[in-house]
């Protein structure tokens, strides 16, 4: 009698990465995935979309939701939408990774924690940037104090930048996955389109090369993304700002700043897409776009 070979069990689950702005959530996701999916910058509020990162190892598939940083300020339409996206991300997941920064604890951290009190999924507290803590003896009392604030499933000091204890965090994630079929093919690392990733790369370079000069009233719209007959991606990016002065900041003296942004963005795109890229960038003033929900919808900041 011929024996029927049973397929090995597979496991899959959704993990939300939450925290106030600029604590290293995007850096952590990129470190876990081994490549850049979510954009990073020294500035807060760099992540605006719920980017999904996918890690498949043998029978395990972890699907990561990288949220915008939850924050208190909600005066602008874009901030309200970012808070809404982050809050909805924690509603239906198998595990929540709450990222905080070293021994700092702010009102925004407290606000995020209060939102997590209604979450059904277990919460792992990841204390990031521990390599930057000057007084190392402050860490243990800080962990003790935080453990009294909430019933965390685990508390783990990490350094997303250096990779410290990230492998332990991944083991915790693996234990949280449920038995079930994988949602994505194993070669997928994100569900976002190349067009979307191109806009994110340009936006990262904007954040990186404008320093503290440019506020967050800047976005990128990809007007053309096509593969030409020579096998090169032709990408046209439109950078939207709110004021004429911001346009001058992006362009820079004799166009040098936008040239640098374009060179760096093209290099990242060619690495990510494994293909030659011809990139052209323009800057346009569109006053009030960050306060206009219709404009935000057309730019992909909210679902139709």
Swiss-Prot record:
Span list, region G2: 45-49
Gene name of this polypeptide: era
Region described as G3: spans on this chain: 66-69
Residue ranges of the region described as G5: 158-160
Primary role: An essential GTPase that binds both GDP and GTP, with rapid nucleotide exchange. Plays a role in 16S rRNA processing and 30S ribosomal subunit biogenesis and possibly also in cell cycle regulation and energy metabolism.
Residues that bind GTP: 19-26, 66-70, 128-131
Annotated stretches, region: G1: 19-26
GO molecular function: GTP binding; GTPase activity; ribosomal small subunit binding; small ribosomal subunit rRNA binding
PROSITE patterns reported for this sequence: G_ERA (PS51713), KH_TYPE_2 (PS50823)
GO BP annotations listed: ribosomal small subunit assembly
UniProt xrefs under Gene3D superfamilies: 3.30.300.20, P-loop containing nucleotide triphosphate hydrolases
Membrane topology of the entry: Peripheral membrane protein
Name assigned to this protein: GTPase Era
The keyword Cell inner membrane is annotated on this UniProt entry: yes
Family: Belongs to the TRAFAC class TrmE-Era-EngA-EngB-Septin-like GTPase superfamily. Era GTPase family.
């Amino acid at each position: 009698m011929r024996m029927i070979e049973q397929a090995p069990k597979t496991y899959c689950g959704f993990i939300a990465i939450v925290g106030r702005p600029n604590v290293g959530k995007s850096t952590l996701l990129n470190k876990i995935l081994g490549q850049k999916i979510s954009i990073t910058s020294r500035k807060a509020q760099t992540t605006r979309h719920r980017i999904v990162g996918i890690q498949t190892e043998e029978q395990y598939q972890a699907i990561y939701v990288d949220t915008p940083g939850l924050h208190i300020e909600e005066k602008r339409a874009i901030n309200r939408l970012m808070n809404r996206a982050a809050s909805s991300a924690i509603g239906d997941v198998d595990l929540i990774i709450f990222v905080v920064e070293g021994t700092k604890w702010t009102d925004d951290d407290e606000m995020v924690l209060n939102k997590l009190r209604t979450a059904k999924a277990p919460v792992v507290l990841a204390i990031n940037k521990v390599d930057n803590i000057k007084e190392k003896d402050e860490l243990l009392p800080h962990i003790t104090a935080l453990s009294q604030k909430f019933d965390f499933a685990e508390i783990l000091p990490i350094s997303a930048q250096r990779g410290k204890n990230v492998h332990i965090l991944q083991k915790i994630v693996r234990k949280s996955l449920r038995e079930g079929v994988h949602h994505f093919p194993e070669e997928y690392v994100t569900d976002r389109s190349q067009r979307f990733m191109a806009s994110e790369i340009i936006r990262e370079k904007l954040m990186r090369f404008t320093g503290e000069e440019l506020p967050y009233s800047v976005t990128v719209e990809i007007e053309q993304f096509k593969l030409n007959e020579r096998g090169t991606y032709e990408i046209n990016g439109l950078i939207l700002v709110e004021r004429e002065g911001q346009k001058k900041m992006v362009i820079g003296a004799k166009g040098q700043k936008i040239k640098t942004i374009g060179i760096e963005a093209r290099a990242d795109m060619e690495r990510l897409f494994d293909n030659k890229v011809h990139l052209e960038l323009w800057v346009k003033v569109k006053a009030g776009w960050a306060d206009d929900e219709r404009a935000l919808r057309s730019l992909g900041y909210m679902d139709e």
